């Protein structure tokens, strides 16, 4: 057997040999890890790998970017850098039963007619984005909050089913792959066997093990954990000029392109026509759930036609054209030993069941939500009852039923408190609402704690380093009583906290100072107004353009805002009618909190104001995302479907049904050249 030391040749021949070995080993890796079809014996694979390692060690300048030797892990990182996604990585809405899915199907059918669905198992892992530039893996990132994730490129390179270079000749300049990292059952069991032998703490379930392994700062540890990856979608795809591309007209076709690129795709993907076939697929996968090599918590159902997906579009956090059809949660019986009442940020008083610990759905559960007084009455549950506990959506434990024949004689009624268990204020229940609330407002310490945590959180003011535990200590030590007090903190006060040295305190003070400059939408969201999430806060800011205008708006004015109904408008008006809330806002502004003014666009700057435009087909000179942004900057609303209210349709190459409908309705159509002239490129 010839070893690496016996290779003879010129420098250029050495380089060529390294390239040959790299390509050959990568082909064998795809055959083994992606196609489940080993092409050579293990001993021969090891010989090739040893040859490559030896040559790269002697000639490191010739190592290829997709060399399989990169998979063993490198130097440990100090932290993961944050990176922005090319387009948001959204979550999916859930269907928990057939009724939910039927409602989803009806919503789609009403908008775009009957559709073929593409179904696949819902892996219980971590969503990631892979970016290949000119075919080579450039970056990998976690989903994070959907807009910003963490750069895990080094760790992803250790996963053997992830190709470092895409296969084939017809590869676009930029390909973003969305998929799931998971730990197969066998790898999970082996990992826990090793931990048990060492006396280390065991991982609770494969998902936790995968999460902990993928986020190791030392990639050598990740490399040892036998993680796997399945691709489930394409993200941004662009040509050499940065124009967006659509690689196939169907989702199934796009998955086939991913397979051709050498990426692993679940073999359980199936096309389903109509409700009956979807339900049959769901039942089949549920039946085989425990036989699969990986854990799943449901199936994902997507509209197969890409143009129909584009017509359906998105809601704030999820696509309208896909849904996660969750499996029934695992259930167990246990005993309700008591009930505590917790107070949340908005004053909601929630009964929390204290349970005899029970192992269900991969975790030990000792608490479960009882939601509200109506739920307690519906269940007819008493302290001392034997109850059936379920992890709803395999995440949130809840009591779903009582076992009446096991009720003990000493069972006690659950009494909802008349006064807040934290501050003693009256507990009120507004007519028409199921939730009872503490009337104490920020006088209530529990509400104050949660309000300040929310104010400092990432999606709100984002004070880096101001986590929940820090806020808890600040309140316990009476250093902070309201959000404005956060901006009065200094190094000497912060060093009074546990595990807060001078350096950490200095960094936190700098983060507090940096957080003073924000945006009006983030500030509104940070205030914690009931029912005002990020999207509503952005709509309020866009509509009124100033805090003063929002403060002065009545319910009639507020319901003119996009997606704001009567209930939300009443919550907003009520919030700004409270003197204490206005005092908090004034104190924040006095502390230096500021944001750039939102200027009213001039009519000249927004000639398309009030018009609805639709994009269809492939735009070669600029991507669809850029075109949408340019049109919106000119005042247009860009919609996903054509209707009689559409003012104009921009038709790129391979325009489909939207163009046909526009022509049928007599709506003006602009080609790409006309669009470029309009936006002034």
From Swiss-Prot:
GO terms for biological process: DNA repair; DNA replication. GO terms for cellular component: cytosol. This is DNA ligase. Keywords: DNA damage, DNA repair, DNA replication, Ligase, Magnesium, Manganese, Metal-binding, NAD, Zinc. Zn(2+) binds at residues 420, 423, 438, 444. It comes from the Bacteria. Its cofactor is Mg(2+); Mn(2+). NCBIfam families: dnlj, PRK07956.1. The keyword Zinc applies. PROSITE patterns: BRCT, DNA_LIGASE_N1, DNA_LIGASE_N2. Its EC number is 6.5.1.2. The active site is at residue 122. PANTHER family: CHROMOSOME TRANSMISSION FIDELITY FACTOR 18 (PTHR23389), DNA LIGASE (PTHR23389:SF9). It comes from Shewanella amazonensis (strain ATCC BAA-1098 / SB2B). Belongs to the NAD-dependent DNA ligase family. LigA subfamily.
